[in-house]
Structures are given as structure tokens and as C-alpha cells.
A protein has these predicted regions:
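Non-catalytic, mostly N-terminal accessory regions of nucleic-acid modification and defense proteins
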Residues: 1-189
């Protein structure tokens, strides 16, 4: 089973790299940042959905977006620190539905930025000098895609790829190591 997941991760990496290469980032540091942070977003999104469903099997995307604010707060309490906490408007599927908005890349960046802010106390890493390193760069697309005419295209391609790939419950329950697979594959490339 892990071989299937390994191939799924590698295919997603290849598809994302193709997007970034087409945007002029082949082999650059910006490609690495976009790739790892896109992948992190995918992981956190699917892990959150997995944890929500572990609380109650009825907690699928369609039900989560309809939940009252109070019920959603209770769900977040139940999930605790098992994963980063996301709001329904931050789910990949929600962003996927917004991809035709003007300046979608800004919607994408704002979403990742808010996830980083909301989870900063628990999920940021600190340097020796006690500087917090956030989950996501504040201007991930803007700072890495110099050609402003390509920013929406890149953000849309990312969200389409992330929405297409589904990491199911089995991948989380078996403890598949996403990031070792990701980084080993990137090093070989």
C-alpha cells in the first residue's frame, strides 16, 4: 500500500514542478518554496479532514462547511493539536471553487497566510534566536513568481492539482511519511 502512496506523492511533485518550470522557476529556490509549501498545505488540509472525520464520520467537507460556528468550535476543541486547525473557507475544495475570481493568487496567499497566523503558536518552528518560522510565507506567489501575468495561472494550477489528488484515511492511519518521500524524491531529481 505504501508504494501506491509513494507514487501518488511523486506524481504530485512532478506535476507541481512542471507548473513551476513553466512559470520560469525550474531548479530555483522559489520552485522549492512553492513546492514544499503547496505540499504542506495539501497535507494539512487532508490531515484536518481526516481528524474531523475521526471525531464523527459525518464530518465530511460538505457537512463541515454547513456547520454552525458553535459546532465548528466544538469540533476544533475535539481535534485539539492533532493537526493544524483550518476554517471551512481555508479548505482546498473551497479555494478550488473560488479559482475564477480576479486576483485568485491573492486569495490563495491570504488563505495560506491566515492558516499560518491561526496556527503560529503551536506549529511554527523557532530558530536559536527565538525567531518564529511560519508554516507559509506571507506572499508565497508574489515573492516567487516575478511575472505578475503568471501569478493567477500558477495559483490556479496549484489548487487544481491539490484538489485532484486525494490522500485518504488509510494513508494517515498507516503513518505514511509524506515528507521523507517528498524530500527523497526531490533530492534524486
Amino acid at each position: 500500500m505504501n508504494e501506491n502512496y509513494k507514487n501518488l506523492v511523486q506524481d504530485l511533485v512532478d506535476d507541481l514542478k512542471a507548473v513551476f518550470t513553466h512559470a520560469g522557476l525550474g531548479g530555483e529556490a522559489g520552485e522549492y518554496k512553492l513546492l514544499t509549501q503547496s505540499f504542506l498545505y495539501k497535507f494539512l488540509n487532508d490531515k484536518f479532514l481526516y481528524e474531523a472525520k475521526a471525531v464523527d464520520t459525518k464530518n465530511i467537507y460538505e457537512e463541515l462547511v454547513k456547520m454552525s460556528l458553535d459546532d465548528y468550535r466544538w469540533l476544533l476543541e475535539d481535534i485539539g493539536t492533532a493537526t493544524a486547525q483550518l476554517k471551512p473557507e481555508q479548505f482546498i475544495e473551497t479555494l478550488h471553487r473560488k479559482q475564477n475570481e480576479d486576483n485568485f493568487y491573492e486569495v490563495f496567499e491570504t488563505t495560506l497566510n491566515q492558516i499560518a497566523i491561526d496556527n503560529n503558536d503551536i506549529f511554527s518552528v523557532h530558530t536559536d534566536g527565538d525567531t518564529a518560522i511560519r508554516l507559509f510565507d506571507e506572499r508565497l506567489i508574489t515573492d516567487n513568481i516575478s511575472d505578475s501575468s503568471k501569478r493567477n495561472q500558477v495559483a490556479r494550477a496549484i489548487i487544481n492539482l491539490l484538489a485532484r489528488v486525494k490522500f485518504d484515511e488509510t494513508i494517515f492511519s498507516q503513518g505514511f511519511d509524506f515528507f521523507s518521500t517528498l524530500f527523497e524524491y526531490m533530492i534524486k531529481d
